[in-house]
Curated annotation (Swiss-Prot):
Gene3D superfamilies: 1.20.5.3790, 3.30.70.2590. One of its GO terms (biological process) is cellulose biosynthetic process. This is Cellulose synthase operon protein D. Keywords: Cellulose biosynthesis. It comes from Komagataeibacter sucrofermentans (strain ATCC 700178 / DSM 15973 / CECT 7291 / JCM 9730 / LMG 18788 / BPR 2001) (Acetobacter xylinus subsp. sucrofermentans). InterPro entries: BcsD_bac (IPR022798), Cellsynth_D_sf (IPR038470). The lineage of its organism: Bacteria, Pseudomonadati, Pseudomonadota, Alphaproteobacteria, Acetobacterales. Pathway: Glycan metabolism; bacterial cellulose biosynthesis.
Amino acid sequence: MTTLNAKPDFSLFLQALSWEIDDQAGIEVRNDLLREVGRGMAGRFQPPLCNTIHQLQIELNALLAMINWGYVKLDLLAEEQAMRIVHEDLPQVGSAGEPAGTWLAPVLEGLYGRWITSQPGAFGDYVVTRDIDAEDLNSVPAQTVILYMRTRSAAT
């Protein structure tokens, strides 16, 4: 019996799974499912309590590095009473997702939503969403996802 020391590669499986989920469940159900997966991931490993956005950004980047999921930049938008979350180097599942290559973006919505609302000073009913129309997607790299965290009433 031959034993290989290589780690398994799940990219082909994930790409086929993404197509099946999209075809059978539809985009809205897929996004809801992936948001819940993100919340579940965030519950498995959480950042320590941080007193500043800068500290939180450092801690979130340390967690993302553990799973090779890119990195994040957090910006408070005082006038909009929102937080801009720019995630770079999101793993791709082939070209799946809208825009292409961003199939896992809803996972980030759940992940950041749970991570950030667990911090001191986070109060209210927050939601993390992608706002594709708010950014010029041609001006950012393909593996960059821009999210906004707002109170639920301001997001709808």
